[in-house]
A protein has these predicted regions:
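Midchain, well-structured core segments that form catalytic/ion-binding scaffolds
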Residues: 2-176
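Conserved beta-strand scaffold positions in the cores of enzyme catalytic domains, especially
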Residues: 11, 199, 249-251
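Active-site-adjacent substrate-binding region
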Residues: 43-44, 50, 57, 65-76, ...
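Generic non-transmembrane alpha-helical segments
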Residues: 65-75, 107-118, 187-196, 215, ...
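A short small-residue
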Residues: 87-94, 198-203, 264-271
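Substrate-recognition/cap regions that form aromatic- and gly/pro-loop-enriched pockets
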Residues: 162-239
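Zn-dependent metallopeptidase/amidohydrolase metal-coordination segment
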Residues: 163, 223-297
Length: 299
C-alpha cells in the first residue's frame, strides 16, 4: 500500500555551494515555433546541445552560392550539394550564468539576415531568434526586470532544430519575483505573433525565497561558517535544485567555488565531477552540526 507522507518541516539538498542558497529564481522554458516554411531557403538549421545552455556551436544549410556568402567573424562557409553550409562558433555558458557568452545560433540568424539569404517568411522568424540571442537579460524581447533580491531576469536560446520545414527555437528564462511565468508567456506570445512565431511546449517553475533571519537558515549558516572558519552570507541564484519542490527548503553545499581542483576533476554538473576527500569530511562535519542544531528548533 502506498501512502503520501506529510511535507517535511525543513530540508536541504547538498546540491549547490557553501555557505547556503536561500532563494532560486523561477525557471520558464518553452519554444518559439515557426510556421511550416514553403519553398524556403533554409534546408536545415540546428544548434546547441541543451535547453539550459547558451549554444556554442550551430550550423545551417541553405539554398545559396558561395558568392552570396561573404566572410564574417566566427562564421565558416563551405559548399555542399544544393547549397552552402554555414557554421558558427560561439562561447557557451549555463542559462543562469550567461554573462560573457556568444550564442552561435544568433550568429547564424544575424548572418542570414544581414546578407538577405532567406525568404521573407523565414526572415520574420529569424528576427525573433536574433532578439532572443542578442541579449541575455531580455531587453530585446521587452521582458527585462529586476526585483532587488535576485540578479536581473535572464533568458537564453539553447537549442534550435528544424523538422518538416518548421523551426523550433527554445528559450530558457530565469526570472525574479516581480514577474510571473504566465506574464512572461503573454509578452513572448504577443511578440512572437508579430514575427510569425507561436510559443509552445511551456514549462514553468516558480521562484522561491526564504528570509535569512529564519532560525533554520541561521542554524545551517552558523554551522557551516564555524566549521570552515569564515563569515559567509546566504546567496540567491538562477539555478534550480530539489529545494524548489518543497515548502521550506534550501540548498546547502557541498561546492566551494574558489577551491582549486586537480585537472582531472570536472566542475559541478560536468563530466568527471568530483569532490576532494578533505572537503567531503568537512561537509560531513557541517551537516552533523547543522542537523544537531536544527533538532533544537521548534518548528
Amino acid at each position: 500500500m502506498m501512502r503520501k507522507a506529510a511535507w517535511p518541516v525543513f530540508l536541504f539538498p547538498p546540491d549547490s555551494e557553501f555557505p547556503l542558497c536561500n532563494g532560486e529564481k523561477g525557471c520558464l522554458c518553452g519554444n518559439f515555433t515557426s510556421v511550416r516554411f514553403k519553398d524556403g531557403a533554409i534546408l536545415d538549421f540546428k544548434g546547441g546541445m541543451a535547453h539550459n545552455a547558451v549554444a556554442d556551436q550551430a550550423c545551417a544549410v541553405i539554398r545559396a552560392s558561395l558568392e552570396q556568402c561573404p566572410k564574417a567573424d566566427r562564421i565558416t562557409v563551405t559548399g555542399v550539394d544544393g547549397g552552402v553550409r554555414i557554421e558558427a562558433a560561439g562561447i557557451g555558458g549555463h542559462a543562469s550564468h550567461a554573462e560573457g557568452t556568444i550564442n552561435a545560433i544568433g550568429l547564424i540568424a544575424d548572418y542570414l539576415l544581414d546578407n538577405s539569404l532567406v525568404t521573407e517568411e523565414e526572415e520574420k522568424f529569424l528576427k525573433i531568434v536574433s532578439l532572443l540571442c542578442e541579449d541575455y537579460q531580455g531587453h530585446g524581447l521587452g521582458i527585462q526586470c529586476d526585483d532587488g533580491i535576485f540578479p536581473p531576469l535572464s533568458i537564453i536560446g539553447g537549442m534550435i532544430r528544424m523538422e518538416d520545414g518548421v523551426l523550433k527555437q527554445n528559450f530558457d528564462s530565469r526570472y525574479p519575483t516581480n514577474t510571473t511565468g504566465s506574464d512572461l508567456v503573454g509578452k513572448l506570445s504577443g511578440l512572437g505573433a508579430r514575427y510569425g512565431a507561436t510559443v509552445t511546449d511551456v514549462e514553468d517553475s516558480v521562484p522561491f525565497y526564504i528570509g535569512a533571519d529564519k532560525p533554520e537558515i541561521k542554524a545551517c549558516l552558523d554551522a557551516g561558517n564555524e566549521i570552515r572558519g569564515v563569515d559567509g552570507k546566504p546567496f540567491t541564484m538562477g539555478g534550480g535544485t530539489y529545494a524548489r519542490h518543497f515548502k521550506n527548503a534550501i540548498s546547502f553545499g557541498t561546492e566551494i567555488p574558489a577551491e582549486p581542483l586537480p585537472d582531472f576533476v570536472g566542475k559541478i554538473h560536468t563530466f568527471d565531477e568530483g569532490i576532494g576527500i578533505d572537503r567531503l569530511k568537512m561537509s560531513l562535519k557541517i551537516y552533523i552540526l547543522a542537523l544537531y542544531r536544527l533538532m533544537q528548533i521548534e518548528f
